[in-house]
Amino acid sequence: MFRSFGAFNYRIWFFGAIISNIGGWMQSTAQDWVVLTELTHNDATAMGATMALQFGPPLVLVGLTGRVADRFDRRRILLVTQTTLMVLAVCVAVLLLTHVMTLPLMLVFAACFGVANAFDAPARQAFVSDMVAMENASNAVALNSASFNMARLIGPAVGGLAIVALGSGWVFVANAATFLAMIVALLLIRTRELMPRPKHPRAGGLLVGLAYVRSRPDLVVVFSMVFLIGAFGMNFPIFASTMALEFHKQADGYGVLSSVLAIGSLTGALLAARRDRARVRVLMLAAGGFGVASIVSALMPTYVSYAVVLVFVGFSTVTMLTTANGYVQTTTDPALRGRVLALYMAVVMGATPIGAPIAGWVADAFGPRAAIVVGGAAGIVAFAIGAWWMVHSGRLHRREDARFLLTLDETRPVRVIDAMQRAVTPPITSATTPIRTEQQRTPGIGVVAEDRALDDLTPDERAPGNAERESCPREPGED
């Protein structure tokens, strides 16, 4: 489960990230509560607007942020973004402590936080894979999610108590201090031990990433599922804060709900770390579980029963996000990883500006329970999309007389080897849905899926003359 800890760089990163993320969750709790109760009178629409401004920049700047993450030193990018976020937290703290903060000013700062995070997120996600060997990338992503959710377990509860005891301004001060842990960790990274980064031969930013994703039907499905739930189901600040008020709780009660959600989230992240690779079917089942758990939570009559169901909501949410993130990272061309992850983060974070205002309006007009049901319905639709794609992507053919079954679970890339090379690979039955790629056919070169053992090949297939066989399986339905 913890094999990525064998890398010194990842260990340093992990512990720095926990401290920084605790502060981040404390600040998130304080910001939501300030907008909902101090700057407005329980206005969920204003809270949705704040979330839209904070999470909108990743969508608007996706073409630039992904290219920056691919072209420049990711460690230095993170040093700049983390320092910027720390300075912004100090500014908000000063305005709150001097009692001059207004809703328009908070909206401006939310947008500034969003711009900084737009550059931080793809670089941060891609940098995780830079610190470990490729075979440990999925494990590192899952442990990174566990770190995030360990902080989510602690941060909101501590933040809620700090708001009641000290005031919201001091919570922003505390978050600014925790950024120092991440900055120190980045400075201690041994750059010589980072994984080499291949350069993509073609120039281009967003268009190159989009073209790559469009050529991958599996990624299109993953992005679609994550977008639906991200837009309508993952508006937890709105759901938890309005439900806390529904049950007549204060900031500490809201913080407890966020921490309870993190109990399930942490469990999901740790279980994901045990899996050796990300599977699309796990993503699909998690989406369905999220939909069911969300709808059930909306029906709970008491604060305690609602909190209990939130454990399952958190579990399914993080299982889905960790699986999707790991799948994207481990199946993407390393030279394009930053751009593809920028698109992924734009889908995850950029869905919020679309869904948060709608969720806020529904909560104001029909109550928070109705808004939660809408989010649950989005999870059911995402499950249906994943199930439909899996049904229609079953058996594929490499050629008419040599059939082999590809499942939808593999995260390892296809390897190009010399046709005369007699390399035995583990007979693991798993592979991604094949992707058509244009390759120049060179005599003596063939493509062999990693999951096919030499003993499984026919005598004809072992012969050198098979060098120019079709390198890509047929699409579904081409029997």
Where are these regions (language model features)?
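Long, low-complexity, intrinsically disordered cytosolic termini of multi-pass membrane proteins
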Residues: 403-479
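Alpha-helical transmembrane-bundle signature of multi-pass membrane transport and export proteins
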Residues: 1-424, 477
